[in-house]
Amino acid sequence: MPYLSILTTVDLSRIPGFGDTTVLELISEIGTDMSKWKNYKHFAAWLNLAPNTKISGGKILSSKRMKKKNKAGQILKQAASTISNSKDSLGDYYRKMRSKLGGKGAVTATAHKLARIIYTMLLNKTEFNSEIIEGNQKKYTEDKILRLEKQIAKLKAA
C-alpha cells in the first residue's frame, strides 16, 4: 500500500510473512526511528528475541529466552511462524533452525533474523533484498556439501 511506504520510507510488506496489517501493527509499536537503539542487538533484546545469558568469570551459567511479553516481538514471532511453509530462503532458514533448536527456538531465531532485517531497512532506508539472504543460504549449502564430502573421504580412508 502506498501509505505504508510514505509512513516508513521503505516497503516492509515486501518481507516474506509480512502483510499490510502486520506492518502497521509493528510500526505502531516500534516507530520508524531506529536511533533509539545502539545497534540491532539492543533492538532484538528490547523485543525479547535475544537470549538472556548469565555469565560469571567468563563461564556461561545459563542462557534462556526471556519470559516477558513484548507486543512487537510477538508480531515478529507470528510472522516467523507463517514463514515456516514458504519456499524462499527465510523458509529454508526456519527449517534449518527447527532441526537444530526445535519449533519454539526456530520461531524465535527466525523472528530475530526478521528483527535484524527490519532494523537495517529502517535505519539505512533500504528496500528488502532477498538476494543477500539467498547468497548466504547458497554459501551455507556449499559449505555443508564440502563438509559431507570430507566426511565421505575420511570414511573411505578408514
Describe the function of each predicted region:
Residues 1-158:
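A detector of single, family-specific signature residues
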